[in-house]
């Protein structure tokens, strides 16, 4: 992909800030639904998908709540609530449907380059956790969305599901796992690159090495963006609609826009590390994404998992994440990001959230100070035979947790102008996996007048659009069969 040359002043109907999975997804929607709209993208780095969307900067899990225990809460009476898990599963099905549509119609090619079938496993230790996992399994198994899920405490069965993790285990240790065959590993970096290749072919204007410095509302309702390129050349760009999809960099731009709903919003950055295996023999012994349970007092983003990944054309094995304390909102950001994001309008909210979350800050600082030996000790809870020399540390991406109303939010959130002319996506997990649902929310809230004429096309692209798949077993079966075939997941 090459930079677009442009004059000192320019215009587009739609402007996307940040060339990650969110902007790529919204761009694909609008290109299909409204091809007459001109589209411009501004990305401050030298290529698309280099920050949170990059394959080395996220876990690559197709988050559909098949194995992630933090999506199923155990209530005070001991029962397990699966509502959030069902919702996330439905949302991920929308992502699979859009990707299938884009492959089926030739918009993007070679699905095996960005998605693979991989079993998803939940793994716990101890009797109390085993009972929780069994209740979770029993609740989820009642839904056709989780059909085929299995549960076992038997060490021999567990050894078939995850042989690397069961080597040299104490035969008397209480263990339990749930297993489901049709999970996915998604290379969101490769998918992002494919999406932007498609957008450029459809005449979208991609501007790499261009930083948006300011956003202002004009009297005619348009937005004026001040943009600076790598050489320091300033440019003014006007647009009817602006989407800020710059990951951690979205918050400062949202604040500059001056929209009402963005004034009280703050952000708290969290960095991440993974251990990556460098021994091909060890990598070959594991073929699953195995999620554990966060330790008592640890935040939701700390759920440990041992992941088979497919990166740069080969199978990899990663363990983590290990969180860290940082002031940066982006991996290639500035230590001034957090301090300068605190404004008179969000000071009270950020301060209140900070006081409430002092244990989180303490946890992050402790995580940042871990030695390799301490990280290896955590890994050995999953892989008892893990050898120091087989594992290296890789720095992952940044996430910025949304602070709103004095509370820290752990999901993703769309903030928009009252008239729908500007929207920004903030937050983290489940992130890229539910990018399609997040961008559908943008379409619904920002293009309400045009939505009726898009209904037929949206239903063609997303057969479950407007329906709750939890109540549609036959439709779900049809969609799953099509998705598996088109995305080459059936074998």
Curated annotation (Swiss-Prot):
EC category: oxidoreductase
Keyword line: FAD, Flavoprotein, Oxidoreductase, Tricarboxylic acid cycle
InterPro entries xrefs: FAD/NAD-bd_sf (IPR036188), MQO (IPR006231)
Signal peptide: none
GO MF, one example: 2-hydroxyglutarate dehydrogenase activity
Biological process per Gene Ontology, one example term: tricarboxylic acid cycle
Recorded superkingdom: Bacteria
Biochemical pathway: Carbohydrate metabolism; tricarboxylic acid cycle; oxaloacetate from (S)-malate (quinone route): step 1/1
Catalytic activity reported: (S)-malate + a quinone = a quinol + oxaloacetate
EC id: 1.1.5.4
Requisite cofactors: FAD
Family from the record: Belongs to the MQO family.
Name used for this protein in its record: Probable malate:quinone oxidoreductase
Species the sequence originates in: Actinobacillus pleuropneumoniae serotype 3 (strain JL03)
């Amino acid at each position: 992909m090459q930079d677009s040359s442009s004059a000192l002043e320019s215009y587009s109907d739609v402007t996307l800030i940040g060339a990650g999975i969110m902007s790529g997804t919204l761009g694909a929607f609008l290109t299909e639904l409204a091809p007459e709209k001109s589209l411009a993208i501004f990305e401050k780095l030298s290529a698309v998908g280099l920050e949170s969307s990059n394959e080395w900067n996220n876990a690559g899990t197709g988050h559909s709540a098949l194995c992630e225990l933090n999506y199923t809460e155990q209530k005070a009476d001991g029962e397990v609530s699966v509502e959030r898990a069902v919702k996330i599963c439905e949302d991920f099905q929308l992502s699979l449907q859009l990707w299938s549509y884009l492959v089926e119609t030739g918009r993007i090619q070679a699905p095996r380059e960005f998605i693979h079938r991989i079993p998803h496993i939940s793994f716990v230790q101890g009797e109390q956790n085993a009972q929780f996992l069994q209740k979770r399994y029993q609740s989820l198994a009642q839904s056709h969305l989780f059909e085929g899920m299995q549960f076992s405490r038997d060490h021999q069965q567990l050894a078939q599901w995850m042989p690397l993790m069961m080597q040299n285990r104490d035969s008397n240790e209480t263990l339990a796992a749930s297993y489901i065959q049709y999970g996915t590993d998604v290379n969101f970096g490769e998918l992002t690159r494919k999406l932007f290749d498609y957008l450029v072919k459809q005449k979208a204007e991609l501007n790499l090495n261009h930083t948006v410095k300011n956003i202002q509302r004009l009297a005619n309702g348009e937005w004026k963006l001040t943009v600076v390129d790598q050489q320091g050349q300033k440019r003014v760009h006007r647009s009817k609609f602006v989407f800020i999809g710059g990951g951690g960099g979205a918050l400062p731009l949202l604040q500059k826009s001056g929209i009402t709903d963005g004034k009280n919003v703050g952000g708290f950055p969290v960095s991440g590390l993974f251990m990556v295996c460098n021994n091909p023999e060890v990598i070959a012994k594991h073929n699953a994404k195995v999620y554990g349970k966060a330790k008592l007092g640890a935040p939701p983003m700390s759920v440990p998992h041992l992941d088979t990944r497919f990166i740069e054309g080969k199978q990899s094995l990663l363990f983590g994440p290990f969180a860290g304390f940082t002031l940066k909102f982006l991996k290639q950001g500035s230590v001034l990001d957090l301090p300068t994001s605190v404004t008179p309008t969000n000071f009270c909210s950020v301060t209140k959230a900070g006081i409430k979350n002092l244990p989180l800050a303490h946890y992050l600082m402790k995580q940042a100070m871990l030695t390799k030996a301490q990280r290896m000790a955590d890994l050995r809870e999953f892989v008892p035979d893990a050898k120091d020399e087989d594992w290296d540390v890789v720095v992952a991406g940044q996430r910025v947790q949304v602070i709103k109303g004095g509370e820290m939010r752990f999901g993703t959130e769309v903030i928009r102008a009252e008239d729908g002319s500007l929207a920004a996506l903030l937050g983290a997990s489940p992130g890229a996996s539910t990018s399609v649902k997040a961008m559908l929310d943008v379409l619904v809230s920002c293009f309400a007048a045009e939505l009726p004429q898009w209904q037929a096309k949206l239903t063609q692209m997303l057969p479950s659009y407007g329906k709750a798949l939890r109540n549609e077993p036959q439709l779900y079966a049809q969609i799953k069969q099509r998705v598996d075939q088109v995305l080459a997941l059936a074998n």
